[in-house]
């Protein structure tokens, strides 16, 4: 299903391919070449500020710092908590942040100058697969809207303005939301209103009735269930199994000036990713750490169920999902494939 675009965008096939090349499919060999040409592996910048949003999938950045993997590679990672994706974007562009845990599609949006400043960007690595969800309010669920088909029937029967929230206009959450609504026969621009809300504010906004549904990363989907205000209509891994989600993003200028630093940070985060996925105990330790006020600031119970693949939908259904959030998965997670970038760009074009 491909509803008409609500507005036009001038993006040729050549521009799509050029933008997709932001990914490390092209960057990794170039980075390696620059490192060897420099004659030393010593990081140019010993301290690196990495922005993150309070979401479970910031964990590999946080744990690389907490467990000291960064020191092993000669850098100090300073995780920097940010309030919104727009703030992350602006601080990356200005140089206030060196790198960031960031939405896949946000990097491409900035590279193309869509809905904000334009700057050449780089995707260093993928940070995680899976682990996001679309939540519908308990009010809608009580009226029978518990999945896409029943939501479409309710919206057709009970006509009013329905509001749904994503976290950033070109981000992954917006793309999952638009795709799912359209697949259910709902045009996200003609049949509904879509707003932008920062991830940590989703649950509070649903509680006061500001939206009928939202798409966001964990732990906020599970938090809505725990608080009795929402139900999980679909997980994003049910939309696209093992989909890419967050990346380690930076500017092209930073890579050119600090190739060894980039490599060191990537190695530290890759080691943290491997550590998280290595055991049940490691996942639980990670959940305890990122739940702290300095990071996500929520109860550990909001994190430690879905990170283990233990899901419930808020309506009595429970299941074990083998395709829960993963950070390494035997190395399958972390390479940023060109085809992944192309998918997000085609969705940007589709939705204007």
Stretches with model-predicted labels:
Residues 38-196, 208-225, 229-242:
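Short, glycine-/small- and polar/acidic-enriched structural segments
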Residues 257-352:
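Secondary-structure end/capping motifs
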Residues 1-15, 29:
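N-terminal secretory signal peptides
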Residues 242-243, 285:
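Short gly/pro-enriched beta-turn/loop segments at secondary-structure junctions
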């Amino acid at each position: 299903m491909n509803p008409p675009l609500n507005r036009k965008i001038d993006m040729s096939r050549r521009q799509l391919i050029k933008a997709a090349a932001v990914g490390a499919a092209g960057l990794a060999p170039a980075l390696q070449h620059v490192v060897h040409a420099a004659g030393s592996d010593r990081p140019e910048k010993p301290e690196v500020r990495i922005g993150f949003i309070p979401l479970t999938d910031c964990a590999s950045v946080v744990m690389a710092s907490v467990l000291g993997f960064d020191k092993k590679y000669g850098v100090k990672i300073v995780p920097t908590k940010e309030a919104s994706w727009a703030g992350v974007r602006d601080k990356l562009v200005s140089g206030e942040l060196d790198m960031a845990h960031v939405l896949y599609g946000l990097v491409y949006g900035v590279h193309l100058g869509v809905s904000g400043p334009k700057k050449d960007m780089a995707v260093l690595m993928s940070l995680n697969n899976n682990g996001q969800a679309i939540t519908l309010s308990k009010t809608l669920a009580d009226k029978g809207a518990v999945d896409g088909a029943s939501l479409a029937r309710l919206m057709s029967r009970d006509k009013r303005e329905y509001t749904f929230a994503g976290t950033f206009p070109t981000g992954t959450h917006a793309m999952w939301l638009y795709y799912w609504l359209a697949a259910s026969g709902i045009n996200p621009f003609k049949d509904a209103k879509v707003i932008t809300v920062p991830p940590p504010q989703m649950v509070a906004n649903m509680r006061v009735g500001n939206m009928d549904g939202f798409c966001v990363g964990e732990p906020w989907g599970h938090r809505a269930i725990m608080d009795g205000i929402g139900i999980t209509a679909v997980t994003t891994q049910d939309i696209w199994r093992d989909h890419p989600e967050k990346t380690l993003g930076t500017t092209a200028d930073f890579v050119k000036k600090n190739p060894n630093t980039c490599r060191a940070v990537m190695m530290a985060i890759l080691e943290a990713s491997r550590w998280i996925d290595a055991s049940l105990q490691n996942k639980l330790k990670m959940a305890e750490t990122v739940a702290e006020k300095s990071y996500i600031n929520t109860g550990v119970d909001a994190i430690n169920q879905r990170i283990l693949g233990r899901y419930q939908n808020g309506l009595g259904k429970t299941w074990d999902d083998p395709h829960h959030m993963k950070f390494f998965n035997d190395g399958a997670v972390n390479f940023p494939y060109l085809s992944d970038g192309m998918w997000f760009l085609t969705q940007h074009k589709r939705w204007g």
